[in-house]
Amino acid sequence: MNCSRDTGDELMAALLAEGINLILPPRDNIAPGDLIIADPQGGARLGGWHEVFNLQLSPEVATDPGFKSFQFRASSILQVGVAASVMGRVLQALGLGSGSFSSAFSSSNADTIQLSIVAPANKELTNFDAVLVQMNEAKAEPAQGYTDRNFFVVTKVWRARGIRISVADKSKKQVDLSAKAVEELTAKAKMELKREDTGSYAFLAASQLIFGLTLREVTYKDGAIVDVAPTGPLKFRGKGPGDPFAFIGDDAFVDLPES
């Protein structure tokens, strides 16, 4: 199932506003300053500066444990079928399971579900412009075989502990999940489903996992490495002059193989 950014949902809109690419499959080996290499056929993989430009760079990273730039963490109130599909993809991105969750809610008189992110945090590359200067001072250019590729610098790594769901019936009253629903959700998520004191339920990982990346595109043009807006099939969103974000493809998820 593809998950378009343009869903009308508030959580997806917040991810869009932050320029977040949700990442598949989940892993814990991506850091701010890393490089993603995209080929003309639309594939993408994690690479390295030394591999492409024969340089060793020194990225500076700051941690924002308060996630202060991300103002909205809850989804719209979604119909069960829609929410179950989105939930499956989000859990997959967090490495907490996959598949359709629609049938799990049928035994609980569930009509709507609201999703939220648990314990979000990020790490940010703070010297992006200085990295570009360093590359150009070294007269860096792509090695043979990389001249037709697109390059994306990871400027932020977004992490979360899991997702929280709040379930309501047709009268908008919060309801508990049935034992059957808990059993099925636990099996599909491959982890414990915890009921919280508020009546919500949380899928929690043992530690914070990467669920998204913010990217900036760089290219080699006229003898220099420059930061540019993507073209062609790539999606571009800018918050203002000098602050562009790069999206890879129409899907909200970036399929980025381990190797």
From Swiss-Prot:
This is Gasdermin bGSDM. The chain crosses the membrane at residues 70-86, 98-116, 162-179, 187-203. Disulfide bonds: none annotated. One of its GO terms (cellular component) is plasma membrane. Palmitoylation helps stabilize the inactive state; may self palmitoylate. Palmitoylation plays a significant role in pore formation. It comes from the Bacteria. Belongs to the bacterial gasdermin family. Coiled coil: none annotated. The keyword Signal does not apply. The N-terminus has marked structural similarity to the mammalian gasdermin N-terminal domain. The C-terminal region wraps around the twisted beta sheet core, probably stabilizing the inactive state. The beta-stranded transmembrane 'fingers' of the active protein form by local refolding of several alpha helices found only in the inactive state. Reorientation of the N-terminus probably flips the palmitoyl moiety for insertion into the membrane. It comes from Bradyrhizobium tropiciagri. One of its GO terms (biological process) is defense response to virus. Residues 244-259 are annotated as: C-terminal region. Keywords: Antiviral defense, Cell inner membrane, Cell membrane, Cytoplasm, Lipoprotein, Membrane, Palmitate, Transmembrane, Transmembrane beta strand. A lipid is attached at residue 3 (S-palmitoyl cysteine).
